Amino acid sequence: MKHFITCLALAFVALNASAQTLWRGAPMNASPAEIRALMPEIQDTSPAQRALDRGALLQIPSTLIADEDFAVTYHFEAERLQRIHLHAKVPTPARTQTLLRALQVTLRTSYGLPIGTKARQDANALPGSVDLKWAFRRMTVQLQMVDGTTVNLTYATNIPSRPAAL
């Protein structure tokens, strides 16, 4: 009986240890080479972008999501994927609201209710600004709209890229 319980516990651990993915199947802590192999349309970021953010190594300059054009940037720390940032500049506030509704429905379906909404302290923030956050296993997903036409969607790991020193 003791062996059965041990085997059952190990099987449970193995099932939960499977690689968790961020956006479009990109595994957490994947290397840039692994992401390139997974997504053939991916490109290196420009030297100017890397100068602003050393971790922003890969990008998809344009991809359609809910009928809007997004730029996607893959951020790495110690050569391990930590964050994927999707950015869209939508032409009109009405289309922005349509996009936000579509994204919220998808995110709620995938991850449940958001864990938080951040109250904006910025006096320039428009009424109806969105800042929602979801937590799912070892990642967070954040959906933001601040200026009426810019939408940011960020998938980030909640696990360190390398063990902390003692």
PLM segments and residue spans:
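Non-cytosolic coordination micro-motifs
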Residues: 19-57, 87-166
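Mid-chain, structured segments of secreted extracytoplasmic proteins
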Residues: 59-103
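N-terminal signal peptide c-region/cleavage motif recognized by signal peptidases
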Residues: 14-16
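Sec-dependent signal peptide recognition
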Residues: 2-8
